[in-house]
């Protein structure tokens, strides 16, 4: 793959997450009954950062959990019978809560749909919203993000790579040609 452009550097990633944090607070008229669920792998550290920014703004902790959508993906053809079903790593209650699913990139919307399915299998929240760092278009399902860091229209021959300090050692969003 050939690097085409650096779309967001560390400062831009942080500014974007701070803005999304403010939008979440404003849209929900505060943070009562909010739960942030990050989609593994990069959605979870993003959820933790947004929770940290919200705490800095509101002075209150927001519960954070993760959702593993592996068993809910419709593009996997074979799943081992020995595989442990562990879709939500919460340690918290989601019934009647306002859930915000957080992911790094929204592309076809299949990951978001799988996360919604995983959440609904556990319990019925009051509502579900979606926050993404990057929306690159190419939706295959009628799902849209409620909070978008940056809209990046791409071709099918381009790849968006999100790097996060917690996983990759740096914060950046880059676009590559395949």
From Swiss-Prot:
Annotated Pfam families: Pribosyltran
Motif extent (PRPP-binding): 99-111
SUPFAM superfamilies to which the protein is assigned, alphabetical: PRTase-like
This enzyme's EC code(s): 2.4.2.9
Keyword RNA-binding: yes
Source domain of life: Bacteria
Keyword Transferase (UniProt): yes
Keywords: Glycosyltransferase, RNA-binding, Transcription, Transcription regulation, Transcription termination, Transferase
One BP annotation, GO: DNA-templated transcription termination
NCBIfam families cross-referenced by the UniProt entry: PRK05205.1-4, PRK05205.1-5
Reported function: Regulates transcriptional attenuation of the pyrimidine nucleotide (pyr) operon by binding in a uridine-dependent manner to specific sites on pyr mRNA. This disrupts an antiterminator hairpin in the RNA and favors formation of a downstream transcription terminator, leading to a reduced expression of downstream genes.
Subunit structure: Homodimer and homohexamer; in equilibrium.
Name this polypeptide is given: Bifunctional protein PyrR
Organism: Clostridium beijerinckii (strain ATCC 51743 / NCIMB 8052) (Clostridium acetobutylicum)
Phylogenetic placement of the source organism: Bacteria, Bacillati, Bacillota, Clostridia, Eubacteriales
């Amino acid at each position: 793959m050939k690097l085409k452009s650096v779309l967001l550097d560390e400062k831009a990633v942080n500014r974007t997450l701070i803005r999304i944090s403010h939008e979440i607070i404003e849209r929900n008229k505060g943070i009562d009954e909010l739960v942030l669920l990050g989609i593994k792998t990069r959605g979870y550290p993003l959820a933790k950062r947004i929770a940290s920014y919200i705490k800095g703004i509101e002075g209150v902790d927001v519960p954070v959990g993760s959702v593993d959508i592996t068993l809910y993906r419709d593009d996997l053809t074979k799943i081992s019978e020995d595989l442990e079903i562990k879709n939500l790593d919460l340690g918290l209650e989601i019934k009647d809560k306002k859930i915000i699913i957080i992911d790094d990139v929204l592309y076809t919307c299949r990951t978001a749909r799988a996360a919604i399915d995983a959440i609904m299998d556990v319990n019925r929240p009051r509502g579900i919203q979606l926050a993404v760092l990057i929306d690159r278009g190419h939706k295959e399902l009628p799902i849209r993000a409620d909070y978008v860091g940056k809209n990046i229209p791409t071709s099918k021959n381009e790849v968006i790579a999100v790097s996060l300090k917690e996983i990759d050692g740096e914060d950046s969003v880059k676009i590559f040609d395949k």
